[in-house]
UniProtKB/Swiss-Prot annotation:
Listed EC numbers: 2.4.1.-
Sequence intervals crossing the membrane: none
Taxonomic path: Eukaryota, Viridiplantae, Streptophyta, Embryophyta, Tracheophyta
GO molecular function, one term: UDP-glucosyltransferase activity
Binding site for UDP-alpha-D-glucose: 283, 339-341, 356-364, 378-381
Family: Belongs to the UDP-glycosyltransferase family.
Any Pfam family: UDPGT
This protein's name: UDP-glycosyltransferase 71D2
UniProt entry keywords in alphabetical sequence: Glycosyltransferase, Transferase
Leader sequence residues: none
Length: 467
């Protein structure tokens, strides 16, 4: 009987909501006592997100969705950092969520169901007071990796000694527990270089320490060093390595162009195995004209087949590409807009991935055994790139500290060199490591695997043993 309810509070963005929904699916499939209620906060311009939830809800039995009323006065992004804006948005929603929780807890239990605890996105840590008022445990679901968590732990403890923002161009090297190598300050999340973003992240870092536990979208196979570090931290919340939280048969991205998707997949079907490099820079990775031209020149130089998911903020692709480019690469290259990233990475023709290093994208590429070329753009992606290249030896370095707002132009020669390195099949150590990790993490999610066991432990801790 499903009589144990968990309240899930995700950040209302696709990149955070999708793994949240998949984690809900895992819990429901793994334990027949659990049902889940999602509280969905409302932002402007999220109709695509509402449609996605409506589409996927039919495939999630024992999950219900409750809309949090829209704020009468919404925080505005203005000159704020994104992190500061999101923190303000979540904090402003706390009273609305509190009212919903009071209603749930005061209503007669339906079918004997008891609310057992909260699971909230790390941006939603201000909701911890709602859980405390209800005398319920509060767990954080971190859609990123344990390296990021180690950095946040460092930030929480370091804040007591130093309350100043980091310098973007600093050559400082940080000794962060959980990392093997010194971490360059320049690869820290971009928010930490801006005063209000720094303040928001420090507040989140301190709130992490007050949670009952932290569920992380990673596994011991991917990040043994940082996860072993947390095993020895008696005064820090329990860390559960429950990843990879990823469904290779998931519903399409809500912004996906289905016609373009079909065309891309048909083109891949005609290509030899592991012969295509896929380039995609995420939902916010729009590129400027000069950079588009350098990428195009780099693709011409390297001579490998390519599929390029190109999104720009300027005019049309034809106006940005070098004159005659499509004619010169005819037959070995294709450009599309929105692409079905999961399906593309799963395709046997794809042998490499030039990525912005969002953690969801990294998880997908590792799952399918596709090695990455690192080209971070924003948020914590620079730290992810450093983690993948220097700590884990699972990626080829193009850039580690690139920022989409820097104005830096990456040269065609640099691009050609990195792509040639990742696509080279002779003595490719990174490719072999990635393929080995792929097999290991797929085993980890099955009964008897480490991630499956971590979910079991979380269920035991929040719900208890079966009676």
């Amino acid at each position: 009987m499903r009589n144990a309810e968990l309240i899930f509070i995700p950040t209302p963005t696709v990149g955070h909501l999708v793994p949240f929904l998949e984690f809900a699916r895992r819990l429901i499939e793994q334990d027949d006592r659990i049902r889940i209620t999602f509280l969905l906060m409302k932002q402007q311009g999220q109709s695509h997100l509402d449609s996605y939830v409506k589409t996927i809800s039919s495939s999630l039995p024992f999950v219900r969705f409750i809309d949090v009323p829209e704020l009468e006065e919404k925080p505005t992004l203005g000159t704020q950092s994104v992190e500061a804006y999101v923190y303000d948005f979540i904090e402003t929603n706390v009273p609305l969520v509190q009212n919903i929780i009071m209603g749930i807890l005061s209503s007669p239990a339906f079918d004997g169901v008891t609310v057992k605890g909260f699971v909230a996105d790390f941006f939603c840590l201000p909701m911890i007071d709602v859980a405390k008022d209800a005398s319920l445990p509060f767990y954080v679901f971190l859609t990123s990796n344990s390296g990021f968590l180690a950095m946040m732990q460092y930030l929480a403890y370091g804040h007591k000694k130093d309350t100043s923002v980091f310098a973007r161009n600093s050559e400082e090297m940080l000794s962060i527990p959980g990392f093997v190598n010194p971490v360059p300050a320049k690869v820290l999340p971009s928010a930490l270089f801006i005063e209000d973003g720094y303040d928001a992240d420090v507040k989140l870092a301190i709130l992490f320490t007050k949670a009952n536990g932290i569920l992380v979208n990673t596994s011991f196979d991917i990040e043994p060093t940082s996860l072993n570090h947390f095993l020895g931290e008696e005064n820090y919340p329990s860390v559960y390595a429950v990843g990879p939280i990823f469904n290779p048969k998931a519903h399409p991205h809500p912004d996906q162009d289905l016609a373009c998707c079909d065309e891309s997949m048909k083109w891949l079907d005609a290509q030899p195995e592991a012969s295509v490099v896929f380039l995609c820079f995420g939902s916010m990775g729009s590129l400027r004209g000069p950079l588009v031209k350098e990428i195009a020149h780099g693709l011409e130089l390297c001579q490998y087949r390519f599929l390029w998911s190109l999104r720009t903020e300027e005019v049309t692709n034809d106006d940005l590409l070098p004159e005659g480019f499509m004619d010169r690469v005819s037959g070995r290259g294709m450009i599309c807009g929105w692409s079905p990233q999961v399906e593309i990475l799963a395709h046997k023709a794809v042998g490499g991935f030039v990525s912005h290093c969002g953690w969801n994208s990294i998880v997908e590429s590792l799952w399918f055994g596709v090695p990455i070329v690192t080209w971070p753009m924003y948020a914590e992606q620079q730290l992810n790139a450093f983690l993948m290249v220097k700590e884990l030896k699972l990626a080829v370095e193009l850039k580690l500290d690139y920022s989409v707002h820097s104005g830096e132009i990456v040269s065609a020669n640099e691009i050609e060199t990195a792509i040639s390195c990742v696509m080279n099949k002779d003595n490719n150590v990174v490719r072999k490591r990635v393929m080995d990790i792929s097999q290991m993490i797929q085993r980890a999610t099955k009964n008897g695997g480490s991630s499956f066991a971590a979910i079991e432990k979380f269920i035991h801790d929040v719900i208890g043993t079966r009676t």
